[in-house]
Regions:
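Eukaryotic partner-binding/assembly regions in large regulatory complexes
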Residues: 1-3
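Conserved Class I S-adenosyl-L-methionine-dependent methyltransferase catalytic core
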Residues: 6, 10-14, 21-54, 58-64, ...
Length: 162
């Protein structure tokens, strides 16, 4: 007995429009792209890449210990178009050089606030189920780094609207 007619019918019942289905799946997985960018930003990967290109080992320096995982992150950044890759060397793109390298005029320092928000949003299911507040501490208790990231994020948002 063939299952094709049955599964085809089920698919039609659940999703009348395959575009809607694809959009739902895409929406469910978009967090992966965000996490790739935020991890690279948090580790300051973009600032570690030299203008002449850098290997994963050079990017790792003394701070990043798992070179294999770093290579996977760099390859994921390459697939997102945030770095270029030639053999074993990684290079900044025009956009990543302009916006993701510390010290540059248009550096998006406020993205660190998104890194901090990740922890809160990751607890959404637990919060809804258990009435748990993900962050109970006051803003002043969150530390200088959190406050600086928050202020920079608000500044970025204000500049965008101006």
């Amino acid at each position: 007995m063939s299952l094709k007619p049955i599964t085809k019918g089920i698919a039609k019942m659940k999703f009348e429009n395959s575009k809607d289905r694809a959009e739902i799946i895409q929406l469910a997985n978009v967090f992966q792209k965000s996490r790739i960018l935020l991890t690279a930003f948090e580790l300051d990967v973009f600032s570690r890449i030299a203008d002449t290109g850098s290997t994963a080992e050079q990017i790792a320096g003394n701070e990043i210990k798992n070179i294999r995982a770093l290579k996977r992150l760099l390859n994921a950044l390459h697939s997102l178009g945030l770095v270029k890759k030639e053999k074993e060397n990684y290079f900044l793109t025009e956009s990543s050089s302009a916006y993701l390298v510390k010290g540059k005029e248009n550096y998006l320092e406020g993205l660190m606030h998104s890194v901090h928000l990740w922890n809160s949003w990751s607890k959404l299911t637990e919060t809804v189920l258990n009435e748990v507040q993900p962050l109970k501490n006051e803003i002043n208790d969150r530390g200088e780094e959190w406050l600086r990231a928050f202020i920079n994020a608000m500044h970025m948002r204000g500049r965008r609207r101006a």
